[in-house]
From Swiss-Prot:
Any Pfam family hit: Cu
Top-rank lineage group of the source organism: Eukaryota
Tissue specificity field: Expressed by the venom gland.
Protein name, as recorded: Cupiennin-3a
Any one GO CC term of the record: extracellular region
Record has Mitochondrion as a keyword: no
Biological classification of the source: Eukaryota, Metazoa, Ecdysozoa, Arthropoda, Chelicerata
Primary localisation category: secreted
Species whose genome carries this gene: Cupiennius salei
Amino acid sequence: GFGSLFKFLGKKLLKTVAKQAAKKQME
């Protein structure tokens, strides 16, 4: 349903943000 899709997108977004944050800390 719509809820599961929203959860999936949320997890994807969190992963992307986490990756970018890790990159910034490494620099």
